[in-house]
Amino acid sequence: MNHSVALNFADGKTFFIAVQEDELLLDAAVRQGINLPLDCREGVCGTCQGTCETGIYEQEYVDEDALSERDLAKRKMLACQTRVKSNAAFYFDHHSSICNAGETLKIATVVTGVELVSETTAILHLDASQHVKQLDFLPGQYARLQIPDTDDWRSYSFANRPNASNQLQFLIRLLPNGVMSNYLRERCQVGQTLIMEAPLGSFYLREVERPLVFIAGGTGLSAFLGMLDNIAEQPNQPSVHLYYGVNTEADLCEQKRLTTYAERIKNFSYHPIISKASEQWQGKSGFIHEHLDKNQLSEQSFDMYLCGPPPMIEAVKTWLDEQAIADCHIYSEKFLQSNTAKT
């Protein structure tokens, strides 16, 4: 029996490998061209150290000088001593080039549609089935897309979960003069080819053991759509609270899809928040951190995922510090304005 294992690196690259039931993780990686750093292969030196972020694994001998009891409690592991017992994801705190891992997968995808889901947002639908058996990625990760007939690339989070038919979705904000935005408005046609590099990013859904708080700003929602799709298919579902902030009512998108999660996820709550609300808006207004409930968040431990503009993320983190809410794990991804930004 093979297990699908994601190897994530500090430069944001992810490589998926197949690991046999009784195979050491290090051996499986090397067999598939990913030469994880190593010295001893005996569980002593600690060179092949990583962290298991999701999945079940066992270790053979681990010397106390390589990993302490505290390290082991934090799911630190040695690839040379690790055997996986389920699909899993591991993080290694070094650049993937050290492993001679090569480039992430570049795929020729086909445009199957562009769907306007708000006045300022579209979903780009791509089909990757002609060029890859199934694209593996972790819910929350992103891809780089090359705008046809240019050297420009833009990065967007997957808005759905991996699927056998390789139908992919990306939530894209339509900017007044954005490179991708202009392409979608003026030149994009069904049947065109887009080159995609994927999967990328260290922002993804870890193994779920505690309640979840998702905080999305603008098209940062895209990453959470993939996560929610994944959670909805799981037999053991955590409670999930989604806070979704946008500038105006016109920016809200995927409202019907978001409300269906209440039917698919047992303990799901959804809180749309408008920062520049009109007089007609009857919901929450202002900024997301102004609507977080200190009492609720202090009652239990939880994992918080944040995706969106840097000011939103910093405001939430500052609020958590000011309220002395410490029993939470925070994972975040900022949308930055650059040649490879998610714009």
UniProtKB/Swiss-Prot annotation:
GO molecular function, one term: 2 iron, 2 sulfur cluster binding
Stretches assigned to the 2Fe-2S ferredoxin-type domain: 3-96
Record pathway: Aromatic compound metabolism; anthranilate degradation via hydroxylation; catechol from anthranilate: step 1/1
Swiss-Prot/TrEMBL catalytic activity: 2 reduced [2Fe-2S]-[ferredoxin] + NAD(+) + H(+) = 2 oxidized [2Fe-2S]-[ferredoxin] + NADH
Gene3D superfamilies reported in the protein's UniProt record: 3.10.20.30, Nucleotide-binding domain of ferredoxin-NADP reductase (FNR) module, Translation factors
Biological process, per Gene Ontology: catabolic process
Cofactors that this protein relies on: FAD; [2Fe-2S] cluster
Keyword Iron-sulfur attributed: yes
Keywords per UniProt: 2Fe-2S, Aromatic hydrocarbons catabolism, FAD, Flavoprotein, Iron, Iron-sulfur, Metal-binding, NAD, Oxidoreductase
Name of the protein: Anthranilate 1,2-dioxygenase electron transfer component
Family assignment from sequence similarity: Belongs to the bacterial ring-hydroxylating dioxygenase ferredoxin reductase family.
Pfam families, alphabetized: FAD_binding_6, Fer2, NAD_binding_1
Protein's job: Electron transfer component of anthranilate 1,2-dioxygenase system.
Species, as recorded: Acinetobacter baylyi (strain ATCC 33305 / BD413 / ADP1)
Residue numbers binding [2Fe-2S] cluster: C40, C45, C48, C80
EC number in record: 1.18.1.3
